[in-house]
């Protein structure tokens, strides 16, 4: 009996010794993997909010392809598929919300959504979710970043040589609209457009102003401008639309047309009319020349109100071709540039909804989008 007990005790001691040896052995560190994305697809889009992540969605199936990390003060992202890079401005404070501020232009590798480089900028970039606060010029070398302190200026960045080129004063003007080679337009508070031209090294070589074509006190232009392929569509708070272009260094301001018919105006009254509105109220499908707008009935200065309907316009014929009521209020609007466009919509509950852009039928909703606030929706293209 004593021999049996002794054998049992020895067996127990052996197990304890083995366990102790196993516990003391170092566990190999697990290495994080790095997935490689397939080629960017025209159905992919970005949803960016203030919470530090831009989600890359595929509108074809509603799946998340990955996330791009950014600061809480990032304004928008510019994607350059030909170089497989994206550019965004990050602003950081040494004490999170106070202290020394550092602004950088972050270069993202779009093959795996990791950071490739940082280029330090003057610590004065505007920090609103507005697509037009950053622009890539068509030399695919210079990125223009809008600053406001409240003095207005732009920072010019060479993303090929990875360096800050310089700062250009743009007093009274905002929104970067790339046009001819190394040139960009800006909207100005005096009702004009400003054209700034750069040299090959990114320094300013010329600027000019257009004639006055709108009154900021009577009918302001939205900051949400849409690239047409040859120029930019500008829309006012009352629904006046026109295209502006630059031809051989000359600013061409197209004739305005109205989103509202006489019947639309009669549907309203002296206080409330149909108006465009929302955080991101417009989208344009370039090849089909279809202009989509979030619309609501409201008083003057309700341009931030979410839309209850989507109106669709043929910009060639300058007339509405469709309208449909939404089962929710739309906040941000984007249209893919696929042959058959998809409409991407966000709402106040941070959900995303995807519609067929021709049939205007719901394809899917993404209830758990990961977004925590109003989202800026962007295509993975240089000017969208």
Model region roles, listed by residue range:
Residues 41-43, 82-84, 139-141, 181-183, ...:
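Short coil/turn segments that connect the beta-strands within blades of beta-propeller domains
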């Amino acid at each position: 009996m004593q021999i049996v007990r002794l054998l049992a005790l020895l067996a127990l001691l052996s197990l304890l010794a083995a366990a102790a040896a196993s516990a003391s052995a170092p566990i190999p560190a697990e290495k994080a993997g790095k997935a490689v994305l397939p080629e960017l697809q025209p159905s992919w889009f970005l949803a960016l909010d203030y919470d530090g992540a831009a989600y890359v969605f595929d509108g074809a199936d509603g799946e998340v392809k990955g996330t791009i990390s950014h600061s809480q003060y990032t304004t928008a992202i510019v994607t350059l598929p030909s170089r497989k890079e994206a550019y965004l401005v990050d602003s950081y404070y040494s004490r999170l919300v106070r202290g020394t501020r550092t602004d950088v232009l972050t270069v993202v590798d779009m093959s795996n959504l990791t950071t490739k480089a940082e280029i330090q900028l003057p610590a004065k970039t505007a920090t609103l979710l507005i697509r037009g606060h950053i622009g890539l010029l068509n030399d695919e070398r210079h990125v223009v970043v809008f600053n406001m302190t409240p003095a207005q200026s732009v920072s010019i960045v060479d993303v090929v040589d990875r360096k800050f080129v310089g700062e250009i004063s743009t007093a009274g003007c905002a929104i970067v609209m790339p046009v001819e080679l190394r040139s960009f337009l800006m909207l100005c508070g005096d009702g004009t457009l400003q054209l700034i031209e750069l040299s090959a090294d990114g320094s300013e070589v010329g600027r000019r102003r257009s004639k006055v074509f709108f009154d900021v006190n009577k009918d302001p232009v939205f900051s949400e401008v849409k690239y047409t392929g040859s120029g930019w569509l500008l829309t006012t708070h009352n629904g006046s639309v026109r295209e502006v272009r630059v031809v051989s260094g000359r600013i061409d301001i197209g004739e305005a047309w109205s989103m509202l018919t006489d019947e639309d105006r009669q549907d309203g009254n002296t206080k409330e009319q149909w108006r465009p509105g929302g955080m991101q109220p417009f989208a344009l499908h370039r090849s089909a020349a279809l202009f989509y707008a979030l619309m609501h009935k409201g008083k003057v200065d309700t341009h931030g109100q979410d839309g209850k309907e989507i109106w669709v316009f043929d910009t060639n014929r300058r007339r509405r071709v469709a309208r449909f009521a939404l089962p929710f209020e739309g906040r941000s609007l984007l249209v893919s540039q696929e042959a058959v466009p998809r409409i991407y919509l966000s709402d106040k509950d941070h959900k995303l909804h995807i519609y067929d852009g021709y049939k205007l039928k719901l394809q899917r909703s993404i209830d758990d989008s990961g977004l925590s606030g109003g989202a800026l929706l962007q295509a993975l293209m240089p000017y969208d």
